Amino acid sequence: MPMKIVLRLFDWASSQVNRQRIILLVGSLALFLSARSSWYQLPPDTLEAFGVSLTIANYYRLIPILFGLLGLFFTIWQVKAKTIRLLFWSGLFIVLLFPYFQSNWTPSVTFLANNYYSQSARVDRNVERNFSDIQAQWKQNISLDEPNTPDASLNALIKNSSFLQVSSLEKFLKDVLSYDVSFFWYISLNWAIAILGFAISLFGMYLDQSHRAMNLLNRDIGNLLPWLAVVLSLLCISILVPNIIHYQLNLSYAKGDYRVVQSMSKTLATLYPPLQGDEFFLERLARAGYYNEQPDISLVALARGLENYRQKNWIKAETHFQESLNLKPKNFLVRGYLASAILNQGISNFNDPSNRNAATAADTFERVLTVFPNHMEAMYDLMLARAVNGEFDKSANIAIKIIENQKYSQRPRSALLGQAYLHLAWKGFKDHNYQKAWQRYRQSVDDSVWKTVIEEEP
């Protein structure tokens, strides 16, 4: 008797299994898998130093969890309703807008992503340009590149009317929706898995409709297009309105109406956070407050620092930036400029042809890392300076940190990683550990062995 019950249950379960249910189950599992960790990844000590939170990236993970539960429910109890399909389409579009919300509502994250990407790119160019000297260990002949000004967190200021033309679609995707390579460099694979999970789930929902599937798909897309147009229009308005007000404030500033500029700028920065990382906007606000006799001391110090920075007076610039940062520790733009001003001092010491001072330069690069942890150019420059100064153990420690930080990016920088492994090879050679030195040297020229684990002695 029990055997018959088991067989009947098995037959019933077999009859319930079909392609649609299997695909819905796979889609649900993919959605659950995408929520295993944060959708954006940056070094934790950098986030702490800048006072940055990945709240949006963490809360966004609730979306695939909810839709994964819905998918499991529909896997067991099949529901054929247009509302369900449109609900999953909406979930997919919300997930696709993750870069927009992450970039626009946490501009400090955009600032860090832009700067880490550009710093790594400049280091790569320096390595490629000096490759022959680097491989030959002629560090004394290498000059370090001056860093560019910190990249802003605001990319969507409209420069002219071409923004409204069809040809500006790429700019809309890159600057408004934040579909930019610098942002994607540090995005987690979980975001792509979530998109895949929604796509699989939607495929499963249309699968059992046989010859009606394409008709239903066309009808659903037709129902979604008006709503999609509304969403895109709202996104455009969210960019156009701040730009219109921004340029209107330029006119008010030119007329000397500083009170209006000061009050409206503060309101605009609250409603449109990316402006908090735009140096022109903040400098204008500082000057308006100063002339209105209601100065924001932190912004005035920032403006003075920017003026000295443009004149390449790095020490005075550092003083003003430090004063501004002391008053507003979470001002990420000030922190970025402060790090750049200190870095330029170290590079000047290192590049001085008549009196190269690698030890002083190294100490200066260390100061950069206390302001801007994991600053790629500062770590690379510090690694070189320590090697030039004969401090191969300290150089190797920085190399290890560079290697560890590459795990946060989607695609490690080959030139930078190659140099880090080369410095570890030199440490092994100086320690007379020739086997380890050879293994590290192989890693510096062959990316296929990067994942080989080699323990370093303390």
Where are these regions (language model features)?
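Cytosolic-side transmembrane helix boundary signature
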Residues: 68-84, 196-229
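Hydrophobic alpha-helical transmembrane segments in integral membrane proteins
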Residues: 101-114, 234-259
